[in-house]
From Swiss-Prot:
One of its GO terms (molecular function) is DNA binding. It comes from Mycoplasma genitalium (strain ATCC 33530 / DSM 19775 / NCTC 10195 / G37) (Mycoplasmoides genitalium). Disruption phenotype: Probably essential, it was not disrupted in a global transposon mutagenesis study. It is an enzyme of class 2 (transferase). GO terms for biological process: DNA-templated DNA replication. InterPro entries: AAA+_ATPase, DNA_pol3_clamp-load_cplx_C, DNA_pol_III_sug/sutau_N, DNA_Rep/Repair_Clamp_Loader, HLD_clamp_pol_III_gamma_tau, P-loop_NTPase. SMART domains: AAA. DNA polymerase III is a complex, multichain enzyme responsible for most of the replicative synthesis in bacteria. This DNA polymerase also exhibits 3' to 5' exonuclease activity. This is DNA polymerase III subunit gamma/tau. The lineage of its organism: Bacteria, Bacillati, Mycoplasmatota, Mycoplasmoidales, Mycoplasmoidaceae. PANTHER family: PROTEIN STICHEL-LIKE 2, REPLICATION FACTOR C / DNA POLYMERASE III GAMMA-TAU SUBUNIT. DNA polymerase III contains a core (composed of alpha, epsilon and theta chains) that associates with a tau subunit. This core dimerizes to form the POLIII' complex. PolIII' associates with the gamma complex (composed of gamma, delta, delta', psi and chi chains) and with the beta chain to form the complete DNA polymerase III complex. The keyword RNA-binding does not apply.
Length: 597
């Protein structure tokens, strides 16, 4: 009968373990010096060796031939533990046996002396699944356990272990195993099992395992049945586990950086039809951008592997592609945040796509395309019609609508607000947005956004007509861009919004109305400030006479918005429209990528 690889090749001594050298050294010294605590807590990602270490410790403290370095695996104690027949080693699955009655049974047996071993060892896997009552029943026993008992708790969710338990145990965090170590182990096992597989395929499996040796062994076990005669290639691995090949990833990156919406979504259609693993796809995408960033900064082709060099030469990456990558990474404090910036770039494409998704062609980045120019002209004509209608209605638009809280009416619950796909902004007024931004005001944000505004104004007012037109054509909503360039300064700012002043009251009111009725302004704000922000626009006179005085005297009563509502306001929104099958597929693609889970 076939034995799965992760069981067959599970380490049975300290020497065979991978990637946890410091933990191994501490535990061996504790055993040699007889300084074992009442309990250990082993935490970390799946497949990093927590339960394996627990079993090896159980052998080490009872091994008849312990040599102060490792267990023998030949004495009766080691053999019984290896075959799971040792009475004094109790392994409990806390995910299924987590009730108070299960713990009471355990506690009753704790004080019984070991049958054959020197120490009894209780291993509780998935300890975070224990109930509060179970932890309470175990607490006293753990604190006053007899010297012949050792508790070992393993968990993937360290934060769920009660503090009262943590303070009575020694905790060790098991780090992820490096891809190099996993690759080395996979290569050894492939030779032992006589699996014909290319090195690149093993490298891909090691990468797919994401630091979990158990996952890597399971993947190797699965792919080993792919072929008996021919060598298993990296293409075979990609097909088996629904992974996008590197060529397609490079093509997708270039499409995103170029703003080629049609190409990007065509690629996503292909990925979806092939059962793409989106989580792994995003991680691979980011890894490739980091390599491209290193190449762009160092100007050294040797930082890329052979496949990446070929892809760059084939796809003709241009300077603007590298420029965006450098900006995306360097404007953040770490690579984790830069990944969010790259995702924001994809968000901008989604916004642009939704602006034109009922019209063809989808490509809007090429001014030389006659159809594309016709599409943009049609869009601008619609904007002009909206502008003319707006001028007729402008005199009826009130700056500060009454917003006193009617206590007789029930206010919506937070989850009702945050779950709305299209945010209702009809009940908002300029004052409550400005006051909310002021509540989270930070001078660092003011200075940061003011600098970006100055850069935008400088580029927008470039005397070189060709440069000016080129920069202007990058904006999805050109009308709001023309208005924002006339801003005088930013007076309040937070991570979700800005209060911005204008000399002309008409411009300020026009931007505000568009912000709450259409959402196009948010797309322009994103392009200028590289961040989703809600805009509260005032004339200098309005701000001075209204907001400043009312904030000072605290006379203005307005509905208080919570932080979640405010952050949702910052996100670009669009009117609900009938959505075709392809548009629903777009929603499916990006729902998991850009929404919090």
């Amino acid at each position: 009968m076939h034995q799965v690889f992760y069981q067959k090749y599970r380490p049975i001594n300290f020497k065979q373990t991978l990637g946890q050298e410091s933990i191994r050294k501490i535990l061996v010294n504790a055993i040699n010096r007889d300084k074992l605590p009442n309990g250990y807590i082993f935490s970390g990602e799946r497949g990093t060796g927590k339960t394996t270490f627990a079993k090896i410790i159980a052998k080490a403290i009872n091994c008849l031939n312990w040599d102060q370095i490792d267990v023998c695996n030949s004495c009766d104690v080691c053999k019984s533990i290896n075959t799971n027949s040792a009475i004094d080693i109790v392994e409990i699955d806390a995910a299924s046996k987590n009730g108070i009655n299960d713990i009471r049974e355990l506690v009753e047996n704790v004080f019984n002396h070991p049958f054959t071993f020197k120490k009894k060892v209780y291993i509780l896997d998935e300890a975070h699944m224990l109930t509060t009552q179970s932890w309470g029943g175990l607490l006293k026993t753990l604190e006053e356990s007899p010297p012949y008992v050792l508790f070992i708790f393993t968990t993937t969710e360290f934060n769920k272990i009660p503090l009262t338990i943590l303070s009575r145990c020694q905790s060790f965090f098991f780090k992820k195993i490096t891809s190099d170590l996993i690759l080395e182990r996979l290569n050894d096992i492939a030779k032992k099992e006589k699996i014909k597989i290319e090195k690149d395929a093993l490298i891909k499996i090691a990468d797919l395992s994401q630091g979990s040796l158990r996952d890597g062994l399971s993947l190797l076990d699965q792919i080993s049945n792919f072929s008996d005669s021919e060598k298993i290639s990296i293409t075979d691995v990609e097909k088996t586990f629904n992974i996008v090949d590197r060529n397609a990833k490079f093509t997708f990156i270039k499409a995103v950086l170029s703003g080629d919406i049609k190409e990007a979504f065509n690629l996503l259609d292909d990925f979806e039809s092939n059962g793409l693993n989106f989580t792994y796809f995003l991680r691979e995408l980011f890894a490739l951008t980091v390599n491209l960033y290193a190449y762009a900064k160092l100007k050294n082709i040797n930082v890329l592997d052979s496949t990446e060099k070929t892809m760059i030469e084939t796809l003709n990456f241009e300077k603007q592609h590298y420029a965006f990558l450098i900006k995306a990474i360097e404007e953040n404090t770490n690579f984790g945040l830069s990944q969010l910036t790259l995702i924001d770039r994809l968000k901008a494409i989604v916004i642009s796509y939704n602006e034109f998704f009922n019209q063809k062609p989808l490509t809007i980045s090429s001014p030389s395309n006659e159809k594309s120019l016709h599409l943009e002209t049609e869009y601008l004509e619609k904007k002009k019609i909206k502008k003319s209608n707006h001028k007729q209605d402008q005199k009826h638009f009130s700056l500060f609508e009454k917003s006193f809280i009617d206590k007789s009416e029930k206010t919506p619950k937070n989850d009702e607000v945050t779950n709305n796909k299209f945010l209702d902004t009809s009940k908002l007024n300029l004052a409550n947005i400005a006051l909310a931004i002021n509540a989270f005001n930070d001078n660092k944000w003011i200075n940061h956004f003011q600098n970006l505004l100055s850069v935008f104004q400088t580029k927008f007012n470039d005397k070189d007509k060709q440069n000016n037109l080129s920069y202007f054509n990058n904006f999805i909503d050109k009308y709001s861009a023309r208005d924002i360039v006339k801003a005088t300064k930013i007076v309040k700012a937070s991570s979700f919004g800005i209060v911005i002043l204008f000399e002309d009251q008409k411009i300020a009111m026009r931007l505000w109305k568009e912000a709450i009725e259409e959402g196009n302004v948010q797309a322009t704000i994103f392009q200028i400030f590289n961040q989703n922000l809600f805009l509260a626009s005032f004339s200098e006179h309005q701000y001075k006479t209204t907001i400043t005085e009312e904030t000072k005297n605290q006379k203005y009563q307005t509905e208080v918005l919570n932080l979640t509502q405010l952050e949702n306001l910052a996100k670009p929104f669009l009117k609900e429209k009938k959505r075709s099958l392809s548009q629903k597929m777009v929603d499916k693609y990006f729902k998991g990528l850009f929404e919090e889970k």
